[in-house]
């Protein structure tokens, strides 16, 4: 059950057997009997939905979950540096995405680090949707749930959840208190006039800054009630008027947004005065008891701004850990660019496998354990990290290789006519995995003549007189070859005989029983399409399953097409890596 929950609802016999044998080596003599039992139990577990598996695990095996959490704490402690002034049981972290788009690999870093630190210190993690900009960063109604799904897929569990657009009354109350203590003022002058005073070092003399508390409260009430139009007034936080960074000087806490033109997907046009990121985030971090903020170093300026707000209200600022940017080479990670591609119809959706969105990586065949391992290895380093896809692929390969079934396929298939077969019909029993722990399939081939298919990339390498080993089957001698057709005859049966001739080993597919396949291979901004044929066992594949196309690479089943009778017509796969 634990194996299934950890791998998207699909348990595998191999890893379960490996775990049993590792913990109970005394059972090795009974391995054959045990694997039969394990296979039966795995089949039963895989019939359950992921939610049913999780429920049963929590209800019946909660001790297993706690044991796993303890191991995770110990592992995290070895990989992550300690947080400053962190007390066990009192650490509160948060992940605060903007639901204007789904999350990508870069966003996953603060999410995973915040979660892992919460686990490490037996604290709690908060999920907070920061959606207070309905005009520029318009929230997508579907993004809230999509982000939740991505986080759950990554193995992240949060203790509390908040949506900022549903907390507007709280921000209004805090804004009023800020005005009352002289920490904010309403600015109804033009942005150009404010910038002139600010940039000339005369901000102390800026007329709106000199207003009384009573005047500002009256103007604030007008802002909230809709008396001002968009761009006619803002609420500013008083800071150091001579701060060396001009952008820090009296930053904007609230602005007017015409929600009759730009309605918010959750609250419509109920509000017109909207808090900026720096105001809402700072207030929530205090009210939600956040003790440690983990975020990219690009937010360092925001930390400085928010500290002025805290000082006005007599609050203590949380500890902040800034880390560098994380970039996946060759992938687009800019939200604006990704949105532009979607709007232009260039992409196949938010889960386009060319994108570094979590959904895109998942669809491509990257498993959550690989993403977690990558992020933990990068950690909280202050320097920017540029990761090649090869690095991520290497981690992913090490995880999926032990549990991925092997399937033979011929891309751009070329027929090979084989004569002289010493049988009328022969069954080849081929294991799905070299370990022999994932079961086997049967591939049949008639005789004394038969046609098989091989990949065109192999066919063009063949020449008259070549001895070739057909994987897990027999050896042939090439009689004649062209890029479109190969003639051959039976040579011998065993691998040893093939080795004597240094024969290459290639995959093959019977001509009389096969399944059409389509492999989509992301290459930069291109999605290269390759068609082919796969062995009959491909008909058993399910969407979401990750396999290895022998000598081609690992791929994830994207879809399975059937005819009106339910017979599999085609399997579409997305290439992950070699």
UniProtKB/Swiss-Prot annotation:
A motif ('HIGH' region) lies at residues 97-107. Its EC number is 6.1.1.17. It catalyses: tRNA(Glu) + L-glutamate + ATP = L-glutamyl-tRNA(Glu) + AMP + diphosphate. One of its GO terms (biological process) is glutamyl-tRNA aminoacylation. One of its GO terms (cellular component) is cytosol. Pfam families: tRNA-synt_1c, tRNA-synt_1c_C, tRNA-synt_1c_C2. The keyword Transmembrane helix does not apply. It comes from the Archaea. Keywords: Aminoacyl-tRNA synthetase, ATP-binding, Cytoplasm, Ligase, Nucleotide-binding, Protein biosynthesis. It is found in: Cytoplasm. The keyword Protein biosynthesis applies. InterPro entries: Gln/Glu-tRNA_Ligase, Glu-tRNA-synth_arc/euk, Glu/Gln-tRNA-synth, Glu/Gln-tRNA-synth_Ib_cat-dom, Glu/Gln-tRNA-synth_Ib_codon-bd, Rbsml_bL25/Gln-tRNA_synth_N, Ribosomal_bL25/Gln-tRNA_synth, Rossmann-like_a/b/a_fold. GO terms for molecular function: ATP binding; glutamate-tRNA ligase activity. Belongs to the class-I aminoacyl-tRNA synthetase family. Glutamate--tRNA ligase type 2 subfamily. Catalyzes the attachment of glutamate to tRNA(Glu) in a two-step reaction: glutamate is first activated by ATP to form Glu-AMP and then transferred to the acceptor end of tRNA(Glu). This is Glutamate--tRNA ligase. The gene is gltX.
């Amino acid at each position: 059950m634990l194996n299934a929950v950890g791998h998207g609802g699909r348990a595998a016999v191999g890893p379960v057997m490996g775990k049993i044998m590792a913990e109970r080596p005394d059972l090795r003599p009974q391995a054959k009997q045990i694997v039969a039992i394990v296979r039966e139990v795995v089949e039963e577990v895989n019939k359950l939905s992921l939610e049913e598996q999780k429920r049963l695990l929590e209800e019946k095996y909660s001790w297993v979950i706690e044991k796993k959490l303890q191991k995770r704490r110990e592992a995290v402690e070895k990989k992550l540096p300690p947080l400053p002034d962190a007390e066990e049981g009192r650490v509160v972290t948060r992940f605060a995405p903007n639901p204007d788009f789904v999350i990508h690999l870069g966003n996953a870093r603060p999410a995973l680090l915040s979660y892992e630190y919460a686990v490490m210190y037996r604290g709690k993690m908060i999920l907070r949707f920061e959606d207070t900009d309905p005009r520029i960063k318009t929230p997508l109604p579907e993004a809230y749930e999509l982000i939740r799904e991505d986080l759950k897929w990554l193995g992240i569990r949060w203790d509390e959840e908040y949506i900022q657009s549903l907390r507007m009354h709280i921000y209004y109350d805090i804004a009023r208190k800020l005005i009352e203590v002289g920490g904010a003022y309403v600015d109804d002058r033009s942005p150009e006039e404010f910038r002139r005073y600010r940039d000339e070092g005369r901000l102390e003399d800026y007329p709106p800054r000199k207003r009384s508390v009573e005047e500002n409260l009256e103007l604030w009430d007008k802002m909230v009630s809709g008396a001002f139009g968009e761009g006619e007034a803002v609420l500013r936080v008083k800071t150091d008027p001579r701060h060396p960074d001009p952008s820090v000087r009296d930053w904007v806490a609230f602005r007017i947004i015409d929600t009759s033109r730009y309605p918010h997907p959750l609250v419509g046009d109920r509000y017109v005065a909207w808090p900026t990121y720096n105001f809402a985030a700072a207030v929530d971090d205090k009210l939600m008891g956040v003790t440690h903020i983990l975020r990219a170093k690009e937010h360092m300026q925001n930390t400085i701004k928010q500290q002025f707000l805290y000082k006005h209200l007599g609050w203590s600022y949380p500890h902040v850990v800034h880390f560098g940017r994380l970039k996946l080479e060759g992938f687009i990670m800019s939200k604006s660019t990704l949105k532009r591609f979607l709007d232009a119809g260039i992409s196949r959706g938010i889960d386009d496998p060319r994108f570094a969105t979590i959904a895109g990586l998942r669809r491509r065949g990257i498993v959550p354990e690989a993403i977690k391992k990558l992020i933990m290895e990068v950690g909280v380093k202050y320097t920017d990290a540029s990761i090649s896809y090869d690095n991520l692929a290497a981690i992913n390969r090490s995880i999926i290789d032990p549990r991925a079934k092997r399937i033979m396929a011929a891309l751009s298939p070329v027929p090979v006519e084989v004569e002289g077969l010493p049988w009328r019909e022969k069954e080849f029993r081929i294991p799905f995995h070299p370990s022999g722990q994932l079961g086997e399939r049967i591939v049949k081939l008639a005789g004394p003549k038969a046609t098989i298919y091989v990949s065109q990339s192999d066919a063009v390498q063949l020449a008259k007189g070549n001895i070739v080993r057909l994987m897990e089957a027999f050896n042939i001698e090439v009689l004649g070859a062209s890029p479109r057709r190969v003639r051959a005859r039976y040579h011998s049966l065993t691998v040893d005989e093939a080795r004597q001739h240094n024969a290459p080993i290639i995959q093959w597919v019977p001509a009389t029983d096969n399944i059409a396949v389509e492999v989509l291979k992301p290459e930069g901004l291109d999605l290269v399409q390759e068609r082919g044929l796969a062995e009959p066992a491909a008909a058993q594949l399910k969407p979401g399953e990750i396999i290895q196309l022998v000598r081609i690479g690992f791929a994830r089943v994207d879809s399975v097409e059937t005819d009106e009778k339910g017979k599999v017509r085609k399997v579409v796969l997305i290439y992950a890596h070699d």
